[in-house]
Structures are given as structure tokens and as C-alpha cells.
């Protein structure tokens, strides 16, 4: 392969650095072949999800997202469900759309006054409202037991946000 050719044309005494977003066996073997006394440095541990959580993906276009969400909500036993949106303005839009469809929910995001956020959390924790629509930033600050479902209305921008979002459920194992 190309890497063999490149390596043959390099000086024998050199510093060689490999960088990879993912480290699978193939990448590690390449490192062992071309680097003397390799050192592995990981910037952060890989994020992973709990095996106690059942995860599903439902593909739909933007035009059908709301209908799909309504269908999901009508077909699951909604105990405590958190719906995540990527932007605060989308939380308000989704709240309004669900209200028009007679689906009760509450909003939870950083622009709400602290008293309103606490009120929303209390309403959710007490079971007075079973659907909480949240942003990632606000969602990081919540600690609620017995969340039955997490719905990503918007695909998270980074994988860490996905892991954090679904980590809201499945804590008890």
C-alpha cells in the first residue's frame, strides 16, 4: 500500500506521529508496523451508552417529524418522557405544535427564569406533566429518576450529546 512506499522513503531515524479519530485494530497494527516503541495517547475516553437502554431509530423527513412524534407518543406508555431539541427556538415551536394537537408538555431551556425552570422540573417530577421538552444545555443540569423515554426530536450535533441525552434514562439498570 501507499503507506509502505512512504515509509521506505523516510529516514530511518525520525519521529513518526499517527492521529486518528477512531482506533480500530487495523490502525493499531499500522502503528506497530511503522513506529518503534509506539506510545498511545487518548485525548478522551470513548463515550458509550448503557446496555440497559433499548435504542431505536426512526427515519423521516422534516415534513413528517411532528406526525411521527405524535405517533410515537400515542403508541408508548408515556411515564416521564424527555424530548430533546437542538435549539431553544425549536423547543418553543414543538411545545406550540404539541399543544395544538392536545398533547400536554412543558418547556425546559436556559432562557427560562430559574423559578420557571424549577417549576417545570417539579411539575415533571411530580407526574403532573409527563413530557419535558429540553435543550442539551438545560438537560445537563437535570437529575430525574424514572425517565422512561428519551426522544431526540433533532439529531444531536455531537456524539457526546447523544450519549448524554439517552443517559437520562436507564440509570437504574
Task: Cite the ranges covered by each PLM segment.
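Conserved helicase RecA-like core
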Residues: 1-173
Amino acid at each position: 500500500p501507499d503507506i509502505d512506499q512512504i515509509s521506505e522513503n523516510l529516514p530511518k531515524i525520525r519521529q513518526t506521529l499517527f492521529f486518528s479519530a477512531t482506533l480500530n485494530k487495523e490502525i493499531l497494527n499500522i502503528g506497530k508496523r511503522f513506529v518503534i516503541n509506539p506510545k498511545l495517547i487518548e485525548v478522551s475516553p470513548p463515550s458509550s451508552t448503557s446496555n440497559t437502554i433499548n435504542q431505536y431509530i426512526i427515519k423521516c423527513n422534516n415534513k413528517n417529524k411532528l406526525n411521527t412524534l405524535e405517533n410515537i407518543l400515542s403508541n408508548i406508555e408515556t411515564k416521564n418522557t424527555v424530548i430533546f431539541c437542538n435549539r431553544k427556538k425549536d423547543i418553543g415551536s414543538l411545545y406550540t405544535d404539541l399543544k395544538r394537537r392536545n398533547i400536554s408538555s412543558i418547556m425546559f431551556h436556559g432562557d427560562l427564569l430559574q423559578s420557571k425552570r424549577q417549576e417545570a422540573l417539579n411539575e415533571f417530577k411530580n407526574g403532573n406533566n409527563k413530557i419535558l421538552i429540553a435543550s442539551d444545555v438545560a438537560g445537563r443540569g437535570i437529575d430525574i429518576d424514572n425517565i422512561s423515554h428519551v426522544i431526540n426530536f433533532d439529531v444531536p450535533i455531537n456524539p457526546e450529546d447523544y450519549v448524554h441525552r439517552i443517559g437520562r434514562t436507564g440509570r437504574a439498570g
